[in-house]
A protein has these predicted regions:
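Cytosolic/nucleoplasmic/matrix-facing N-terminal domains/tails
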Residues: 1-167
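C-terminal single-pass membrane-anchor helix
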Residues: 169-203
């Protein structure tokens, strides 16, 4: 099974991928192999997590293992459509025979090879609400390419979740913990001030 997980920087895609994969792998008794998750502390997680070196050799990992690659476009990025897909891409065509479950994390699905987008079993997108602790989590069986357009998710399953602070220290976010602190947009604050002033002047 291939899952693509997307979201803008600071929208919790890596944090929530770690949380969700860890809980599922632990419940199923599966081992997780990860690449490019900076400063990950496996001892703080429930499942067994191991670092591996070459994402292009993902298919050589033990059968039935779970695989997570952050900033996956570095190894599974787009290519000239006239070129033949390399082995580490075509191997996804028959991955069900080995029981691998792969999670590719990137900011935008269009950063990934079109071959993978067509083979994807599930697309999870995270959308942070007003830079707060609240997120919208969208899930679709097919890849939704225009992730910058909110209406693109009208047919996706939607769930509201919150950033879990317990996972802030599990890995080193390139954004830093301060990036996850709530911050209301300036336009929203100004609008509230105008409304408050109007109410005050009406008395």
């Amino acid at each position: 099974m291939l899952y693509i997980r997307t979201g803008k920087p600071g929208h919790g895609k890596t944090l929530n991928t770690i949380k969700e994969v860890d809980q599922k792998a632990h419940a199923e008794g599966r081992t997780v192999y990860f690449h490019n998750i900076n400063g990950l502390q496996p001892e703080q997680l429930k499942a067994s997590w191991y670092k591996f070196d070459d994402p292009e050799k993902w298919f050589e990992l033990p059968n039935d293992s779970v695989i997570v690659v952050d900033e996956a476009q570095g190894w599974f990025g787009g290519r000239d459509p006239r070129a033949r897909p390399p082995e580490h891409i075509t191997r996804f065509e028959t991955m069900r025979h080995s029981g691998h479950e792969v999670h590719l994390i990137t900011q935008d699905p269009r950063y990934l090879d079109v071959h993978l987008r067509r083979l994807c079993n599930g697309h999870v997108h995270y959308w942070r609400v007003f830079k707060s602790q609240q997120l919208l989590r969208f899930v679709s069986e097919a890849v939704i390419e225009k992730v910058e357009v909110k209406s693109s998710f009208k047919d996706a399953d939607k769930k509201t979740i919150r950033l879990d602070k317990k996972y802030f220290g599990v890995y080193t976010s390139t954004q830093g913990q301060h990036h996850f602190q709530a911050k209301m947009p300036t336009k929203f604050i100004m609008a509230m001030l105008v409304i408050s002033a109007a109410v005050y002047m009406s008395y």
